[in-house]
């Protein structure tokens, strides 16, 4: 959820909230996820003690974050009728985790990852709607009956519309008898031909590039892909994802939460740690990646281990498991046999 919020809104705030012992929690700690809208961009100014508030974030004289000024309710929530409470509440910075990926020096708020593609997606949506309206309009006219003589037929014309033009309905199995001088011309609306699909492909290709995602993952279209192209795109895509996993999610979210959880659990008497500093030294293993051709990848990993390029620990951790746990399971399986 944090990663999705960061991708859509550019950032996510996690408030660490210690609880009372009577709340019945095993470890009296909860996390509250706050959207980007909860921290107002227009909250700026000076505090009484001389700190500076920029975009809802309070900085001290040396530029260190000391507090966040959150709204008490979401600005788009029309069901919250609390109007007597202050607009914002000050939360100390040690209780707030600001999850975002900075791309500029001095950046203090997150930028949505989908922002570079929004204009193209909006124009593509308008183009699709216009093409759908054009096809709907063209499908309403089955054909036209033309006459060479201006006189009315003996049996009268069809029911006229508001402009005075006669109209005739067309039903399945109808055999229309025409009078002398009348002719039927079927509607042949202009078509965009092959330009529609080519335009969509180029636009979605640019959208995929701006999002940093492979084209086939954005559209689900693998008609023009092969094994080599899919693997090349996936390798680059997974490199970007791993940067976010280890450089943003693990560093900004997992490590602070783990440290606070250990602290609260030890204070609550749930853990007896002889070396708290060693307990904080953990390794974060993200979920594994599934390859297009697992056989070739496993063979390549085996060759890399035999050549001494990589270790078995790294190969096992790349699958999302802990090497010690795998060794214990293998030993248990061997003991059963």
Residue ranges: model-predicted function:
Residues 2, 16-18, 134-140, 218-222, ...:
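Short coil/turn segments at secondary-structure boundaries
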